[in-house]
């Protein structure tokens, strides 16, 4: 099965969103401040990835129309 570039971007976007939720859960459950901060940092990084992928998807969709 072949996937279009936009399909691949959408799959990547979903994985990044999953990672955000995963790290948020661990940040919330962390009892040590250093561990909590590390997971909060990872959440922020994943949010950046979500934003970049969403912007690229939006560009691709606009080019198709």
What is the predicted role of each segment?
Residues 1-65:
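Non-heme di-metal
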């Amino acid at each position: 099965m072949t996937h279009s570039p936009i399909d691949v971007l959408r799959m990547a976007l979903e994985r990044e969103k999953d990672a955000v939720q995963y790290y948020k859960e661990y940040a919330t459950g962390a009892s040590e401040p250093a561990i909590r901060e590390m997971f909060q940092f990872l959440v922020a990084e994943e949010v950046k990835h979500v934003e970049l992928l969403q912007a690229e998807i939006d560009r691709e969709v606009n080019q198709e129309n």
